[in-house]
């Protein structure tokens, strides 16, 4: 899980979603997981 000030999709399978007021990226590749911090 990377915590970044701005989250972006890295590949075509990345999905940007909003959970509990936090913006997250979920993907099949575990290295692409991010959340906004």
UniProtKB/Swiss-Prot annotation:
Q: Which domain of life is it from?
A: Bacteria
Family membership noted in the UniProt record: Belongs to the bacterial ribosomal protein bL36 family.
Q: What is this protein called?
A: Large ribosomal subunit protein bL36
The GO terms describing molecular function are: structural constituent of ribosome
InterPro entries the UniProt entry points to = Ribosomal_bL36 (IPR000473), Ribosomal_bL36_sp (IPR035977)
Matches recorded under PROSITE patterns: RIBOSOMAL_L36
One of the protein's GO biological processes: translation
The cross-references to PANTHER family, in alphabetical order and at most eight, read: 50S RIBOSOMAL PROTEIN L36, CHLOROPLASTIC, LARGE RIBOSOMAL SUBUNIT PROTEIN BL36C
Q: Which Pfam families match?
A: Ribosomal_L36
Look up the record and report any one GO term of the cellular component aspect.
ribonucleoprotein complex
Q: What are the UniProt keywords, alphabetically?
A: Ribonucleoprotein, Ribosomal protein
